[in-house]
């Protein structure tokens, strides 16, 4: 049995894109679809009934459930699609176990990112297209925030939140225009 302190020597059953598997492999997590320590759910096009069923069985057998982020939906070239929160929900419902969301808006993720960048939150800006993850994670981490309207949140949905971004832009391209001193179409 692996000791609790061997965080980077853990085994996981991973439902996710190759980038997630590579990142986990890079920190020493090995893949195991028989008796893993964790079931880790990210976003992937290969999500199907078989992998959900396997994940449910593994969680019921003691694996801890982790999800990469709590985004319910996300933008694609074809419109809005289910994101990680929607993909992990059937596993949570079938097992009665709640996933630990390690990505935005998790403060640990934000603090770790700032530390790795050797950056203080007062000198950082969080840019994103979602009020419920991107903007709130920036605000709760002490950063200025920029909401871009090229994704999920709209000017109308901003009004439904008790907090506001520092700035609203039409898209990330407007950041370059602002840096050059050009006027944006805001």
Report residues per predicted region.
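Short, small-residue-biased leader/transition segments that mark boundaries at the very start
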Residues: 1-8
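Asp-based, Mg2+/Mn2+-dependent phosphohydrolase catalytic module
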Residues: 9-186
């Amino acid at each position: 049995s692996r000791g609790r302190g061997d965080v980077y020597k853990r085994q996981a059953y991973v439902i996710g894109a190759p980038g997630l598997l590579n990142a986990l492999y890079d920190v020493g997590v090995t893949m195991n679809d028989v008796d893993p320590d964790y079931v880790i759910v990210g976003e992937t096009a290969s999500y199907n009934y078989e992998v959900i069923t396997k994940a449910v069985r593994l969680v019921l057998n003691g694996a801890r459930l982790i999800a990469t982020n709590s985004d319910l939906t996300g933008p694609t070239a074809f419109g809005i699609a289910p994101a990680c929160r929607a993909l992990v929900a059937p596993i949570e419902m079938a097992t009665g176990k709640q996933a630990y969301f390690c990505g935005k808006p998790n403060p640990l993720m934000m603090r770790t990112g700032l530390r790795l960048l050797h950056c203080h939150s007062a000198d950082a800006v969080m840019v994103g297209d979602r009020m419920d993850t991107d903007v709130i994670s920036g605000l709760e981490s002490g950063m200025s925030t920029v909401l871009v309207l090229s994704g999920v949140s709209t000017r109308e949905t901003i009004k439904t939140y008790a907090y506001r971004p520092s700035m609203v832009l039409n898209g990330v391209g407007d950041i370059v225009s602002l840096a050059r001193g050009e006027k944006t179409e805001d």
